[in-house]
Amino acid sequence: VFSGEVHDADIAIADGKIVGVGTGFTATETIDVTGKVIAPGFIDAHVHIESSMVPPSRFARAVVPRGTTTVIADPHEIANVAGLDGVAFMARDARDGPLSVVLMAPSCVPASHLTGSGARLGAEDLAALRSSGLVHGLGEVMNFPGVLAGDPEVMAKIGAFEGLVVDGHAPGLGAHPAGGGAVGA
């Protein structure tokens, strides 16, 4: 993918997973793809599906044919309007579709303490969302000043996802002396 090289090889698949690339495999079934190119699917590591103004099922129709197989989605926009019901809608609409949608819990609802929104998700709400199995981690913690200051609510949200991925968001942090501490260094 990165070098632009094309390798002529066989691909061994077992239980729906690629288990080998090369030659000399013994197969119970073969598919001739001579002249075809097989490439990995694209994983979009950060997307807000709602920004496309369509639900996940419609979003999938646009991105899957173009090679995207998986998205890591932070549904904080719909959560700011509809709260936990919005997140549950996103999960239901994405289920069983052709696109793997990995939802993260929206950490910033409302988006900042300076704005209002249709919902508020506190640490308890996010802990319940984690327990529901609908999310795989904590999405985009945008309140990096709160992280650096050890704000109790922000830290409780992060703590609710101990052992899972917690996404950060720190524009302009750069060489800030606390930068290493923000990532646990």
Question: Language-model segments: which ranges?
Answer:
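Functional cores that coordinate and move charged inorganic groups
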Residues: P152-A185
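Short loop/turn motifs at secondary-structure junctions and domain boundaries
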Residues: V1-G4, S52, S117-A119
